[in-house]
Amino acid sequence: MKKEKAVVVFSGGQDSTTCLFWAIEQFAEVEAVTFNYNQRHKLEIDCAVEIAKELGIKHTVLDMSLLNQLAPNALTRTDMEITHEEGELPSTFVDGRNLLFLSFAAVLAKQVGARHIVTGVCETDFSGYPDCRDVFVKSLNVTLNLSMDYPFVIHTPLMWIDKAETWKLSDELGAFEFVREKTLTCYNGIIGDGCGECPACQLRKAGLDTYLQEREGASN
């Protein structure tokens, strides 16, 4: 893969930034694509733009505002509370989001001569999102190849690792402090360690605390 090109689906969050660093190490050339779907915090897009600029990565922002029109949710509507009732999908789930993002990333990838697509979806910290499952990604990979007659390969470096292991991967890639300080995971739009209260921040912090304990234990 060292001689090939990849497109990374990039939000500016912890997971996709870790995947961006992973792709930079794995591929000869990397581009990033970010989707503007009228997310709750425009800072998310600004964050992605700044990270790509700092890393010298060619970056495309695509207008996907129609997604909010089709599937209103707590990620795009400030009047909707972020909730997750047992047995139901979280209010942050956006129907069709990863299906559309990966499909448009594939169109872009083919246009720029890349066959590798990298995404940070993960089953281990599964939040009930059906489009984060490995079976979905594998199925879509086949569908995209057939639909465009092109040998795409969708890579999911985080699929089988939890948040602590994601922090470990960023550390192994030499990007731990960068990811911790410059990414935006928080649903309330606070860069870095975030608000500490929303579900995304709690998951991120729990993983970070676990990894730091493991790293400290290994060094003793």
UniProtKB/Swiss-Prot annotation:
GO terms for biological process: queuosine biosynthetic process. Pathway: Purine metabolism; 7-cyano-7-deazaguanine biosynthesis. Binds 1 zinc ion per subunit. It comes from the Bacteria. Transmembrane segments: none annotated. Keywords: ATP-binding, Ligase, Metal-binding, Nucleotide-binding, Queuosine biosynthesis, Zinc. Its cofactor is Zn(2+). GO terms for molecular function: ATP binding; ligase activity, forming carbon-nitrogen bonds; zinc ion binding. Its EC number is 6.3.4.20. Catalyzes the ATP-dependent conversion of 7-carboxy-7-deazaguanine (CDG) to 7-cyano-7-deazaguanine (preQ(0)). HAMAP family: QueC (MF_01633). NCBIfam families: 7-cyano-7-deazaguanine synthase QueC. Homodimer. Belongs to the QueC family. This is 7-cyano-7-deazaguanine synthase. The lineage of its organism: Bacteria, Bacillati, Bacillota, Bacilli, Bacillales.
